[in-house]
Amino acid sequence: MSMSPRPPFPSFIPESAPFTPEQRTWLNGLFAGVFGLQEGVTPLSPADAAKLLPGLLDAGAAPATTPTEADDGAPWHDPAMPMPDRMKLADGRPLPRRMMAAMAQQDCGQCGYNCKDYADKLFDKSEKRLNLCVPGGKETSRMLKQLYAELDGGASAPAVEIAEEPKRVAYSPPGRSRDNPVYATFLSRQRLNKEGSEKETWHIEIDLAESGLDYEVGDSFGIFPANAPSLVEGVLEALGAPGDFPIGDRTLREVLTDGVSLSPAPDMLFQLVSYITGGERKAKAKALAEGKDPDGDAASLDVLAALHKFPGLRMDPEAFIEALDPLQPRVYSISSSLKSSPGRVTLTVDAVRYEVDKRMRYGVCSTFLGGRCSPGDRLRVYVQKAHGFALPADPAKPVIMIGPGTGIAPFRAFLHERQAIKAPGRNWLFFGHQRSNHDFFYEEELTAMRASGHLTRLTLAWSRDANEKIYVQHRMREVGRDIWAWLNDGAHVYVCGDAQRMAKDVETALVDIVAQHGGCTPAQAKDFVADLKAKGRYQADVY
């Protein structure tokens, strides 16, 4: 059978473009590779490409990298690592990886992506919002602003500008992303702490009938909150503007309630203040806009505190609103299973309340759910699919779940799911909090599961019951031999909770357990845990 000759590469580069024939051939081959490389064609090496395009690398563009060089496991992808350390590890890497390093590394989904995908979207300019990383806050948005500038003429700007192809906006079904929320109905809340607790934690129930949403255990639930009315009124008073001032087709009060963030004051607000004031106040506002801290109070300046810091200004309400960040949704781990609670979703939420300079501050969504919502209220919501946080495909596999505080949320869902499907695998839960008499979340449920044998083991840690603080990682070390035995039986390990301390300490404890009871060196133990991660047998949902 005769074979037809291989067709040439299609022409992506117009003949009028300022390239030599060799350069045009190479670029056409490059784009052919991007859009589907023809069978049997070997791409040029970076060295050969540099010979064809000698001016490209000389003009400051980063050299091409192999897939292995571009994706080296992201050593900065550690939520406990400070920003300067992450950026140092990413130094010299391609710009998208440095953008990734600037993020909070939690893969929490509040931005609508995981960290790597958000960075990639910023790099290709299909996403232009630099303030979506809620846990990273102003520190992340400032660093992203610096890095994003490189796309438009900085050190990593391309030497040759090629017209951008119009970006396609990915469609997401209703309720499947922050950009396309649906409505669900608030049903109830129940306090999980007993009287005398220093914490305020709520079990929240939401009806999904109107939304038509479903979810899997391990997923998270996004909610668009509203700012506290007292805070909104305080801002209106400090601004000296009427609440019914028109902002587009809404009022100023409405926009302040659910349209903009009144939490940490953004740099743009201080920049606006610097434009309309003078003298020392202008200098301070300009310094704050540049990320400096002239009076040592920058960390405590929410929008109302910023207005109080510069009293007497009469800002145009529209300009004021333009200077604020949009109010972001908040994402919570789902603590229920549709198989045991059809048509409903439950959340486990710590209400955040604290005082700064004799004024109460409130967690915008936690106190919205934990105090201001009433049964029947309609909420804008969406399901955030899990990024590699799910039960084993084999229900016979044992699972070890480590979730102190609200970190218990996904594991309550796991337990209900495994109970509903009659999974034969063993279940071991580590839970901890401050005091056993006040902070034992879901005590009756867990006690019943333990009595029935569904919860094979329940290990508890209380940090305030004795003089010595006991945390889950301490309990892990006490039963390290048994953990090692479960691992040898194929157990999957899950961690949920605080990224800065707990998750790091738990991983350290697990490495030590492997070294001690597995009879290996610390380096080998680290490799063992890394292998668990690579195989999906060690998964974390941290915040």
Regions found by a protein language model. Give the residues of each.
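Glycine-rich phosphate/diphosphate-binding loops and the adjacent beta-loop-alpha structural elements
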Residues: 127
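Local cysteine-cluster metal-coordination motifs and their immediate loop/turn environment
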Residues: 103-121, 130-146
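Short, charged low-complexity linear segments at domain edges
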Residues: 76-97, 139-146
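Amphipathic alpha-helical packing elements
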Residues: 98-106, 110, 118-121, 215-216, ...
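C-terminal accessory/binding modules appended to enzymatic or scaffolding proteins
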Residues: 88-98, 102-107, 178-179, 184-187
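Predominant activation on well-ordered alpha-helical scaffold segments within soluble catalytic domains
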Residues: 24, 28, 96, 100, ...
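FNR-like FAD-binding dehydrogenase module
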Residues: 2-19, 29, 35-80, 146-543
